[in-house]
From Swiss-Prot:
Pfam families: Aminotran_1_2
Species annotation: Campylobacter concisus (strain 13826)
One function term, GO molecular function aspect: pyridoxal phosphate binding
Gene3D superfamilies attached to this UniProt entry: Aspartate Aminotransferase, domain 1, Type I PLP-dependent aspartate aminotransferase-like (Major domain)
Protein name: Histidinol-phosphate aminotransferase
Residues annotated as signal peptide: none
GO biological process per UniProt: L-histidine biosynthetic process
Modified residues (N6-(pyridoxal phosphate)lysine): K227
Length: 365
């Protein structure tokens, strides 16, 4: 069978290994497996959301309110914007896909950092667009601008992942706003802020505000309920932009693109500030332990504004480290697919991190 040509160039996105795989392959009891590979919230779903899901299960036979009125109103109030400046997606990934299908094509280019979220390239290639990357693996706005100015007539979409996944670095928000002002109004700047809650907690200067983003004619802010709000399995994301951008992307959204349980979970999670605060407090207390461990063991790391930390290695190979840890029942994220000898580790609870340090120290001896 003949398929579209762009598929020849595409690779499958490599998701973090599931707990079930470790149970099957290594015979380890599920309760003894620690998954720190996919940047999920280590505290699991909040109690308030759990109770809401039990209640909403009775209505699983009903389609959700496709206007997502209550969720949009909650987000609008939180961010100081109107609900008309919001779009809801099945994860923020879906809105990335909308943005590219709205703006990119075979005659255009898409610009991103040297190492960043893999789905940008995967979705961009579906449109036939040319991929431009900075030479710097981390975000360097001067280099972004240099490449953009050299290919201004071609580049239709720019992705800034702030904080950046899978490395964790971030840039001051004021620098980001200045950058957008240097970009032509017909080029869409996508600000993927999936970890913005973490960046804001660590350093308020890194907080990108949706209320500022909507002032630009050519920018969209993306957020998610997967990380700080612990709803990775619910798949709820959102975009915030001016009404022209939201109107265009909404034409690509199928009806009922999130589920009735997902919608209720997101509405309840949005109001659970206590849970989010607990998440942030634990994250950066435990992050300090990882930084101390790295320094004590001569491991290079990237200062992180997220819920993960990336360790860079000379020896041994990251794939060897991850495989040995996997056999111990600890799932980490090998970054060899990004051409890095590095391991990304989600910040867990204290007891989970204790096991990581114990096992990793043995491997590195």
């Amino acid at each position: 069978m003949k398929f579209n040509d762009f598929l020849d160039d595409l690779v499958n996105y490599e998701a973090g290994k599931p707990i079930e795989l470790v149970v099957r392959e290594f015979g380890i009891d599920a309760k003894d497996v620690i998954k720190l590979a996919s940047n999920e919230n280590p505290f699991g779903t909040s109690k308030r959301v759990e109770e809401a899901l039990k209640e909403v299960a009775k209505n699983a036979h009903l389609y959700p309110d496709d206007s997502y009125f209550e969720l949009k109103e909650g987000l609008a109030k939180k961010f100081g914007v109107t609900s008309k400046k919001l779009i809801i997606g099945s994860g923020s990934d879906q809105i990335i896909e909308f943005a590219l299908h709205a703006k990119a094509n075979r005659q255009s280019g898409v610009l991103m950092a040297g190492v960043t979220f893999a789905m940008y390239e995967i979705y961009a290639k579906q449109t036939g667009a040319k991929i431009y990357r900075t030479k710097s693996v981390e975000h360097n706005l001067s280099e972004f601008l240099e490449i953009y100015n050299a290919h201004k007539d071609e580049i239709s979409v720019i992705f800034l992942c702030l904080p950046n996944n899978p490395l964790g670095e971030c840039i001051d928000a004021d620098e980001v706003y200045k950058f957008i002002k240097n970009i032509d109004e017909n080029t869409l700047v996508v600000l993927d802020c999936a970890y913005n809650e973490f960046a804001k907690f660590k350093d308020s200067k890194k907080e990108i505000k949706p209320s500022e983003v909507v002032k630009f004619k050519n920018a969209i802010y993306l957020g998610t309920f997967s990380k700080a709000y612990a709803l990775g399995g619910m798949r709820v994301g959102y975009g915030v932009a001016n009404e022209e951008i939201i109107g265009a992307l909404s034409k690509l959204r199928a009806p009922f693109n999130i589920t009735t349980p997902s919608l209720r979970a997101a509405i309840v999670a949005l109001g659970d500030d206590e849970f989010v605060q607990k998440t942030m407090q634990n994250n950066f207390e435990q992050m300090k332990r990882y930084e101390d461990f790295a320094e004590q063991n001569g491991i290079e790391f990237i200062p992180s504004y997220t819920n993960f930390i990336t360790f860079k290695f000379n020896e041994p190979k990251s794939s060897q480290i991850c495989e040995k840890m996997l056999k111990k029942g600890i799932i980490l994220r090998d970054l060899k697919s990004y051409a890095l000898n590095a391991v990304r580790i989600t910040i867990g609870q204290a007891w989970q991190n204790d096991r990581v340090f114990e096992e990793l120290e043995q491997i590195l001896k």
